[in-house]
Amino acid sequence: MKFASLLLGAALVTSVAGAAQLDITLNQPQLDVQPYHRPYIAVWVEDAQRNPVATIALWKQMEEGDKWLKDLRQFWRKIGRSAGKEIDGVTGATRRPGDHQLQWDGKDNLGKPLPAGEYLLNIEASREEGGRDYHRVAITLGKQGDISLPAKVELGPIQIKVK
Protein backbone atom coordinates (compact mmCIF):
# COMPACT_ATOMS: atom_id res chain seq x y z
CA MET A 1 0.00 0.00 0.00
CA LYS A 2 2.83 2.41 0.89
CA PHE A 3 4.57 1.54 -2.37
CA ALA A 4 1.41 2.24 -4.40
CA SER A 5 0.88 5.62 -2.75
CA LEU A 6 4.54 6.52 -3.33
CA LEU A 7 4.18 5.64 -7.01
CA LEU A 8 0.99 7.67 -7.29
CA GLY A 9 2.64 10.63 -5.54
CA ALA A 10 5.67 10.44 -7.83
CA ALA A 11 3.41 10.28 -10.89
CA LEU A 12 1.49 13.37 -9.75
CA VAL A 13 4.67 15.34 -9.13
CA THR A 14 6.02 14.34 -12.53
CA SER A 15 2.79 15.31 -14.28
CA VAL A 16 2.69 18.75 -12.68
CA ALA A 17 6.35 19.61 -13.16
CA GLY A 18 7.23 17.67 -16.30
CA ALA A 19 4.18 18.11 -18.50
CA ALA A 20 3.87 21.90 -18.44
CA GLN A 21 3.79 23.32 -21.93
CA LEU A 22 3.12 26.63 -23.63
CA ASP A 23 1.83 26.94 -27.17
CA ILE A 24 2.30 30.45 -28.51
CA THR A 25 0.88 31.84 -31.74
CA LEU A 26 2.77 35.03 -32.44
CA ASN A 27 1.59 37.28 -35.27
CA GLN A 28 4.08 39.45 -37.07
CA PRO A 29 2.11 42.03 -39.11
CA GLN A 30 2.95 43.22 -42.60
CA LEU A 31 3.95 46.87 -42.29
CA ASP A 32 3.77 49.29 -45.20
CA VAL A 33 7.10 51.05 -44.61
CA GLN A 34 10.25 51.52 -46.69
CA PRO A 35 12.79 50.24 -46.06
CA TYR A 36 11.22 47.30 -44.24
CA HIS A 37 13.54 45.34 -41.97
CA ARG A 38 12.21 42.22 -40.31
CA PRO A 39 12.11 42.68 -36.53
CA TYR A 40 14.31 40.92 -34.06
CA ILE A 41 12.07 38.98 -31.67
CA ALA A 42 12.92 37.47 -28.28
CA VAL A 43 10.67 35.26 -26.16
CA TRP A 44 11.74 34.19 -22.67
CA VAL A 45 10.42 33.13 -19.27
CA GLU A 46 11.30 34.61 -15.87
CA ASP A 47 10.51 33.27 -12.42
CA ALA A 48 8.39 35.25 -9.95
CA GLN A 49 11.51 37.19 -8.83
CA ARG A 50 12.09 38.21 -12.48
CA ASN A 51 15.17 36.04 -12.92
CA PRO A 52 15.40 34.57 -16.44
CA VAL A 53 14.91 30.79 -16.41
CA ALA A 54 14.30 29.86 -20.06
CA THR A 55 14.86 31.41 -23.46
CA ILE A 56 12.21 30.13 -25.86
CA ALA A 57 13.22 31.94 -29.05
CA LEU A 58 15.55 34.61 -30.38
CA TRP A 59 15.09 35.66 -34.01
CA LYS A 60 17.79 37.91 -35.42
CA GLN A 61 19.59 38.62 -38.68
CA MET A 62 22.24 35.97 -38.72
CA GLU A 63 24.65 37.81 -41.05
CA GLU A 64 24.49 40.94 -38.88
CA GLY A 65 25.58 39.04 -35.78
CA ASP A 66 24.66 40.85 -32.58
CA LYS A 67 24.78 44.35 -34.11
CA TRP A 68 21.09 45.15 -33.50
CA LEU A 69 20.51 42.76 -30.60
CA LYS A 70 20.88 45.59 -28.08
CA ASP A 71 17.68 47.13 -29.48
CA LEU A 72 15.80 44.31 -27.72
CA ARG A 73 16.34 46.35 -24.56
CA GLN A 74 14.60 44.14 -21.98
CA PHE A 75 16.09 40.96 -23.43
CA TRP A 76 19.54 42.53 -23.70
CA ARG A 77 19.53 43.66 -20.05
CA LYS A 78 18.23 40.34 -18.72
CA ILE A 79 19.95 37.81 -20.96
CA GLY A 80 21.63 39.08 -24.13
CA ARG A 81 24.69 40.91 -22.86
CA SER A 82 25.79 38.04 -20.64
CA ALA A 83 24.69 35.16 -22.86
CA GLY A 84 27.20 32.94 -24.50
CA LYS A 85 26.72 30.02 -26.83
CA GLU A 86 23.86 28.64 -24.69
CA ILE A 87 21.26 30.70 -26.58
CA ASP A 88 22.43 29.38 -29.94
CA GLY A 89 20.02 26.45 -29.57
CA VAL A 90 16.99 28.77 -29.70
CA THR A 91 18.42 31.38 -32.07
CA GLY A 92 17.18 31.57 -35.63
CA ALA A 93 16.79 33.97 -38.51
CA THR A 94 14.16 36.71 -38.55
CA ARG A 95 10.77 35.65 -39.93
CA ARG A 96 8.48 36.94 -42.65
CA PRO A 97 5.19 38.56 -41.63
CA GLY A 98 2.46 36.11 -40.65
CA ASP A 99 1.54 33.74 -37.83
CA HIS A 100 4.36 31.81 -36.19
CA GLN A 101 4.04 28.89 -33.76
CA LEU A 102 6.29 28.49 -30.75
CA GLN A 103 6.24 25.73 -28.15
CA TRP A 104 7.94 25.56 -24.79
CA ASP A 105 8.24 22.32 -22.87
CA GLY A 106 8.32 23.88 -19.38
CA LYS A 107 12.04 23.23 -18.90
CA ASP A 108 14.71 25.70 -17.91
CA ASN A 109 17.78 26.46 -20.02
CA LEU A 110 19.54 23.43 -18.49
CA GLY A 111 16.74 21.06 -19.52
CA LYS A 112 15.27 20.63 -16.04
CA PRO A 113 11.47 20.76 -15.64
CA LEU A 114 10.34 23.86 -13.77
CA PRO A 115 8.05 23.37 -10.78
CA ALA A 116 4.43 24.42 -11.02
CA GLY A 117 3.87 28.04 -10.04
CA GLU A 118 3.91 31.65 -11.20
CA TYR A 119 6.18 32.78 -14.03
CA LEU A 120 6.42 35.74 -16.40
CA LEU A 121 6.38 35.30 -20.17
CA ASN A 122 8.20 38.08 -22.04
CA ILE A 123 7.85 38.82 -25.75
CA GLU A 124 9.84 41.66 -27.27
CA ALA A 125 10.22 42.89 -30.86
CA SER A 126 12.46 45.59 -32.26
CA ARG A 127 13.02 46.60 -35.85
CA GLU A 128 15.98 48.46 -37.35
CA GLU A 129 14.74 51.93 -38.35
CA GLY A 130 11.40 50.97 -36.81
CA GLY A 131 9.53 50.55 -33.58
CA ARG A 132 9.77 48.41 -30.49
CA ASP A 133 7.03 46.42 -28.72
CA TYR A 134 7.12 44.54 -25.44
CA HIS A 135 4.66 42.29 -23.62
CA ARG A 136 5.06 40.78 -20.15
CA VAL A 137 2.30 38.46 -18.95
CA ALA A 138 1.94 36.28 -15.85
CA ILE A 139 1.47 32.56 -16.47
CA THR A 140 0.89 29.73 -14.03
CA LEU A 141 2.58 26.44 -14.82
CA GLY A 142 0.42 23.55 -13.70
CA LYS A 143 -2.82 25.43 -14.42
CA GLN A 144 -4.35 25.27 -17.89
CA GLY A 145 -5.57 28.44 -19.50
CA ASP A 146 -5.68 30.68 -22.55
CA ILE A 147 -4.26 34.19 -22.75
CA SER A 148 -4.75 36.73 -25.54
CA LEU A 149 -2.47 39.72 -25.94
CA PRO A 150 -3.57 42.67 -28.08
CA ALA A 151 -1.85 43.75 -31.27
CA LYS A 152 0.73 46.49 -31.15
CA VAL A 153 2.72 47.92 -34.07
CA GLU A 154 5.60 45.44 -34.43
CA LEU A 155 3.66 42.52 -32.93
CA GLY A 156 0.19 41.49 -33.99
CA PRO A 157 -2.21 39.66 -31.66
CA ILE A 158 -0.64 36.86 -29.62
CA GLN A 159 -2.41 33.73 -28.37
CA ILE A 160 -0.95 31.70 -25.50
CA LYS A 161 -2.20 28.32 -24.37
CA VAL A 162 -0.88 26.97 -21.06
CA LYS A 163 -1.17 23.19 -20.86
Per-range role (PLM):
Residues P29-L31, K107-G111:
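Short beta-turn/strand-loop junction motif enriched in small, turn-promoting residues
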Residues M1-G9:
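Sec-dependent signal peptide recognition
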Residues Q28-H100, A125:
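Contiguous segments within soluble domain cores/interaction surfaces
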Residues G18-M62, G130-K163:
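Primarily secretory-pathway and cell-envelope proteins
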Residues H100, L114-E124:
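A short tyrosine-centered beta-strand micro-motif
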Residues L102-G106:
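Short edge beta-strand/strand-turn motifs with a hydrophobic/aromatic core
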Residues A10-G18:
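Hydrophobic h-region of N-terminal signal peptides that target proteins for export
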Residues A93-P97, N109-K112, S126-Y134:
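Short acidic/polar inter-strand loop motif in beta-rich domains
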